[in-house]
């Protein structure tokens, strides 16, 4: 798979070892203030191509990793490697590897679900959380268990859990 930096010349693509695997990370900007951009499903770090230069121009160092199993990031075999706990550990390890003094997580879709849970578990690990497209887990769970309307709307989430 081509690196984002081969397509967008203002982005650098680096390899970051975190939580025992190699992450492909698109990066732009410098400094101790990090914006960690977590993409959705079925997306890729290139999702953030328009936000990265804007944030870098504001003085942030921007990291947009391809999450575990996406792009050129390592693809561990077996569903146990994709549990929410492991994905939250990935976020913690990426933050640690960045050595940033201030961290903002910007997340969309599947990345937002991971970010919500990470922020609830480790509130002191980040300074800001920006979520696109995903409600807080508490009202979402309430809507899912209240009746069939939301469950019907989110049928595809369950569909993708089937072991083909």
PLM features: residue spans?
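Flexible "cap/lid" subdomain of the alpha/beta-hydrolase fold that forms the substrate-access gate
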Residues: 2-12, 21-23, 63, 70-106, ...
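Conserved HGGG/HGGXW glycine-rich cap/lid loop of the alpha/beta-hydrolase fold
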Residues: 27-74
């Amino acid at each position: 798979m081509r690196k984002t930096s081969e397509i967008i010349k203002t982005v650098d693509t680096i390899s970051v070892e975190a939580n025992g695997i190699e992450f492909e990370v698109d990066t732009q900007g410098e400094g101790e203030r990090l914006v960690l951009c977590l993409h959705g499903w079925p997306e890729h770090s290139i999702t953030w191509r328009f936000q990265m230069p804007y944030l870098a121009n504001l003085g942030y160092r921007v990291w947009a990793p391809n999450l575990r199993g996406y792009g050129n990031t390592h693809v561990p075999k077996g569903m146990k490697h994709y549990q929410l706990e492991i994905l939250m550990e990935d976020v913690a390890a990426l933050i640690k590897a960045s050595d940033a003094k201030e961290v903002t997580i910007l997340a969309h879709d599947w990345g937002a679900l991971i970010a919500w849970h990470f922020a609830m578990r480790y509130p002191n690990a980040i300074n800001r959380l920006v979520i696109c497209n995903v409600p807080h887990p508490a009202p979402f769970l309430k809507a899912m268990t209240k009746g069939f309307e939301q469950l019907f709307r989110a049928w595809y989430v369950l569909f993708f859990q089937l072991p083909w």
